């Protein structure tokens, strides 16, 4: 910091005196009320919104891991961190995971300008979908999200998020399906699944549970007098009137399953979500990928300050008529 005398002066430091010590910054981060920092960030977002720089038409929500300042096999030095898992890929056919001790920085980003609208830091064991509704509600207090287009990865593929975007904010959700717990059933063109013996199964009514409707399919020979199953299924000789295997298919009767994810409109709109990845990359470049503090309060405040800095760069660039509102290097040069 000693190299940037003008910047220090703008920040209120006396360049003729020594800078505050490490422990002074450490105490500041530990005692600072995060609500005050959130108010500063909200004021910046409002200012940029009034200037037409940020917009809530296309918003993306994503999280990025923040490693705690502790050993991976002994996290006792930071009692507030938690064990989290980070997926190295969004492809459903790739299972590359990384476990870590630390936190998550959840950021709602304007996918047009690439600037943050709201942020929330949680321990690493909190699921992304668990805090989505809270983040949207908080961001809506600063900038209206009515009629927004919400973009997120498959980690947010939860029915409640779709319903919140649709009913509360009157928007549209562009989220790929998460194939968790699903089976790739072989089916005919008519939609009837094929059993293990290669025979088309018959419809056998519908069932409703857990807020979903499922179509039941049964064995075509369930009431047959034959003593042998074509594939020797374990349920054939069950001693019951109806024999053989059964399968279920979820009937797309809700908003989540009614979205056509194969159309060109969905693919082009969802491509805007890459702005979230770009912002997370800029966030990590500020040194937040691994913390130097060792408590939850300091971690939360440090992350919020990093997002405030990104918005400050944008504000300074816009007020000075520059288009480089994403570059911290350009801001330092202008200072």
Segments predicted by a language model, with ranges:
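Short, charged, surface-exposed secondary-structure boundary motifs
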Residues: 130, 181-190
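Basic, amphipathic alpha-helical segments enriched in Lys/Arg and hydrophobic/aromatic residues
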Residues: 266-335
């Amino acid at each position: 910091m000693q190299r940037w005398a003008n910047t220090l002066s703008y920040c209120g430091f006396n360049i003729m005196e020594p800078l505050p010590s490490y422990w002074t910054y450490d105490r500041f981060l530990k005692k600072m009320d995060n609500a005050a920092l959130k108010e500063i960030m909200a004021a910046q977002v409002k200012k940029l919104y009034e200037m037409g720089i940020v917009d809530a038409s296309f918003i993306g929500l994503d999280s990025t891991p923040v490693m705690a300042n502790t050993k991976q096999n002994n996290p006792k030095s930071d009692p507030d961190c938690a064990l989290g898992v980070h997926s190295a890929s969004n492809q459903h056919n790739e299972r590359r995971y990384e476990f870590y001790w630390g936190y998550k920085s959840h950021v709602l980003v304007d996918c047009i300008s690439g600037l943050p609208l709201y942020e929330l830091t949680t321990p690493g064991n909190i699921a992304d979908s668990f805090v989505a509704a809270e983040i949207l509600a908080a961001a809506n207090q600063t900038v209206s999200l009515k009629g927004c287009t919400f973009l997120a990865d498959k980690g947010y593929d939860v029915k409640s998020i779709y319903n919140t975007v649709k009913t509360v904010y009157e928007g549209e959700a562009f989220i790929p399906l998460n194939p968790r717990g699903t089976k790739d059933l072989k089916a005919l063109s008519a939609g009837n699944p094929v059993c293990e013996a290669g025979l088309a199964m018959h419809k056998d009514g519908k069932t409703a549970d857990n807020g979903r409707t499922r179509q039941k399919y049964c064995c075509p020979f369930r009431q047959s007098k034959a003593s042998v199953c074509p594939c020797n299924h374990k349920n054939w000789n069950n001693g019951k009137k109806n024999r053989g295997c059964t399968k279920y298919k979820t009937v797309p009767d809700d908003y989540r399953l009614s979205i056509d994810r194969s159309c060109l409109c969905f693919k082009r709109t969802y491509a805007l979500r890459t702005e979230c990845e770009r912002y997370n990359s800029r966030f990590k470049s500020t040194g937040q990928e691994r913390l130097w503090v060792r408590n939850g309060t300091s971690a939360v405040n440090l992350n919020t300050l990093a997002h405030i800095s990104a918005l400050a760069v944008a504000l300074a660039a816009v007020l000075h008529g520059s288009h480089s509102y994403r570059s911290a290097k350009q801001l330092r040069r202008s200072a």
